[in-house]
Curated annotation (Swiss-Prot):
Belongs to the EMX homeobox family. This is Ventral anterior homeobox 2a. Transcription factor that may function in dorsoventral specification of the forebrain. Regulates the expression of Wnt signaling antagonists including the expression of a truncated tcf7l2 isoform that cannot bind ctnnb1 and acts therefore as a potent dominant-negative Wnt antagonist. Plays a crucial role in eye development and, in particular, in the specification of the ventral optic vesicle. May be a regulator of axial polarization in the retina. SMART domains: HOX (SM00389). The keyword Nucleus applies. Residues 204-223 have a biased composition (Low complexity). It holds the Pfam family Homeodomain. Its main location: nucleus.
Amino acid sequence: MFDQATSMGDGVSEERSPLCGKSATSCSERVRDKGTRADLECSLRGHSLKDIPVTSTSSPGSSKEEVQDSQSTGEADYCRRILVRDAKGTIREIVLPKGLDLDRPKRTRTSFTAEQLYRLELEFQRCQYVVGRERTELARQLNLSETQVKVWFQNRRTKQKKDQSRDSEKRSSSTSESFATCNILRLLEQGRLLSVPAPPNLISSSQNNMGTSSGNGTNLGTSGSTSPIISTTPPGAGAFSLQVPSLAASSSPRLPTSLCFPGPLLGGLHEIPSGYGLGSSAFEPYTRLDRKDTASSKKSTS
């Protein structure tokens, strides 16, 4: 009986063994997973997250390449990073470019003495380009290096060019202004802006200081001013008389009371009444003068 049971048990075990054999690999994997989970839980309870080393599935070679790439990209992005606290108290990060060389010492500015500047200026007035042995000898005498002497001459030539260009601009502007002033003064002296242009067929024959004409006996009115009177009488024509005020007169000179142009000259008798005076502008030479007597006469007539 027991033998059959054992044999039956063996047979059952033998029959079940193929089923267990199929799932043997899966069972072993589950046991391993449970073990790793238990280990992880223990490590989490005993240590903090920062102390746990991070495992990576990449190979050592690939990890080295990634580190090199990160270093190379970091070097290409910036040269140095500086944390700065502003007035509000916030901390900001300043990223300096890679090409900025902070460790390089700054170039010191050369300060020349009065004697050195005097000698350099004398040499520059003699020759603007000092090269070769002359520059070497000058640097030795002034206790300077050849580079300092060369740089000083370069800066001095640049300064001279700037001064020359500035002087030429000032000279051109001053000459243009003086030319315009001379033109205006010449026109004023000739009386072209203040006198009435005469016809081209008139020829000046004589000057009459008494204010009388010899042609038709036309009497010209005299004024209180001392300006000369110019009288021109063409042959066979009427008299033409014009009084030109001098430039040295008062600011508002007056024309004579009557300025007559006889009929044969301009085709009729034209008079400029005494109510008109010489204006201050060249474009408006005559301006009407209002007098009190005319205003009072108008009121009396009304």
